[in-house]
Amino acid sequence: MQTSMFLTLTGLVLLFVVCYASESEEKEFPKELLSSIFAADSDFKEEERGCFGYKCDYYKGCCSGYVCSPTWKWCVRPGPGRR
């Protein structure tokens, strides 16, 4: 039982050391990855969403293919039961 506890503890310490070493090597990698994800994400939002969810009212209409929801006052896609 003592041997298995010793091996488990040694394995956890080894895992910690390996993770710490790889993290210190690649400190900039997560920042670069996140910035590239958010940069690509903002590019797709314009094409994908159009003006879905934008605020609208009597004076400011919606993009083509969307209607202003009278209840929520934002742009939605027209569908059955929507006015």
UniProtKB/Swiss-Prot annotation:
Residues 1-21 form the signal peptide. GO terms for molecular function: carbohydrate binding; ion channel inhibitor activity; toxin activity. It holds the Pfam family Toxin_12. It comes from the Eukaryota. It is found in: Secreted. Expressed by the venom gland. Keywords: Cleavage on pair of basic residues, Disulfide bond, Knottin, Lectin, Secreted, Signal, Toxin. The keyword Coiled coil does not apply. Residues 22-49 form a propeptide. Disulfide bonds join C51-C63, C56-C68, C62-C75. GO terms for cellular component: extracellular region. The presence of a 'disulfide through disulfide knot' structurally defines this protein as a knottin. Agglutinates erythrocytes. Belongs to the neurotoxin 10 (Hwtx-1) family. 51 (Hntx-8) subfamily. Hntx-8 sub-subfamily. This is U5-theraphotoxin-Hs1b 2.
